[in-house]
């Protein structure tokens, strides 16, 4: 019998074992679609970003007008830019849902996969932040100033670190050029990390909605899940193109249509919607270093979730108390997101502080306590 190239060729073998003959749990739901959606988001962002970079000039005097030129004079430049800007929002929607799925179904017990995933989230956040600075509008400039300034809270080396990051004594041309370099580099780093993420995942195989081993019932990835993924792509591209074509600036800040001016501070400096929850946590502590630590902890706390799993069951499918806690956490994150977009005044200050406290309490205290309590109730 002639050798099957798909199974014998060194490169095709890799593709085959990851996308074609991969044994997959038969009962994984649509919540398992977000991994592939993140992959397609990354590809879309790299492609549109590359096309934008060909027309972009990383210079403070030209950056803003080069972006305007792309939108006005380049063939479909407006569409490429709108897809890139809104693609970032969809990237974050997908990653947050992906993390939520992992949290709900106990996928974090694949520790290496989970930890590389958290590193991927951090890399994505860094990429989105430096990318937001590039159009060099008012919010770009002041966002860069405020967020980079947070590093000055680090004792002893803080100020030196900030000036080193800026390439001077304020956010200026050197900052913009290095941010462009970083924004170009990081997505490829994300792609490499995603490969590692998948390698770790395929060591143990995918989890499933019941949180039980599925070795007895696996089906090949292709055609079943390849088709399901393509359906997912279509369902995601529909709202993305709708947003990019009909209301491309819905999620942006009007302040960014004004070129950066170091002499005029915008009335409300706030990041894009996907960072608002972390921004609210940062603002809820009236001390600079404390706020920075809370901001870092808001994401880094995800590294602790595998250690805080006290339940004898993996998923929350059959744990109503944990489910209640999970949805409380989701509602709490939405409250934080809303508070982050509001000015720093009463009642938003106290709401933000309570929501921040609740966020950490649920993750660090209540989840392990409720997990242990459920074990007791089930006589485990």
From Swiss-Prot:
CDD domains: cytochrome_b_C, Cytochrome_b_N. Keywords: Electron transport, Heme, Iron, Membrane, Metal-binding, Mitochondrion, Mitochondrion inner membrane, Respiratory chain, Transmembrane, Transmembrane helix, Transport, Ubiquinone. A ubiquinone binds at residue 202. Its main location: mitochondrion. Heme b b562 binds at residues 84, 183. It is a multi-pass membrane protein. One of its GO terms (cellular component) is mitochondrial inner membrane. GO terms for biological process: mitochondrial electron transport, ubiquinol to cytochrome c. It is found in: Mitochondrion inner membrane. Its cofactor is heme b. GO terms for molecular function: metal ion binding; ubiquinol-cytochrome-c reductase activity. It holds the Pfam family Cytochrome_B. Heme b b566 binds at residues 98, 197. Component of the ubiquinol-cytochrome c reductase complex (complex III or cytochrome b-c1 complex) that is part of the mitochondrial respiratory chain. The b-c1 complex mediates electron transfer from ubiquinol to cytochrome c. Contributes to the generation of a proton gradient across the mitochondrial membrane that is then used for ATP synthesis. Heme 1 (or BL or b562) is low-potential and absorbs at about 562 nm, and heme 2 (or BH or b566) is high-potential and absorbs at about 566 nm. PANTHER family: CYTOCHROME B. The cytochrome bc1 complex contains 11 subunits: 3 respiratory subunits (MT-CYB, CYC1 and UQCRFS1), 2 core proteins (UQCRC1 and UQCRC2) and 6 low-molecular weight proteins (UQCRH/QCR6, UQCRB/QCR7, UQCRQ/QCR8, UQCR10/QCR9, UQCR11/QCR10 and a cleavage product of UQCRFS1). This cytochrome bc1 complex then forms a dimer. Belongs to the cytochrome b family. This is Cytochrome b.
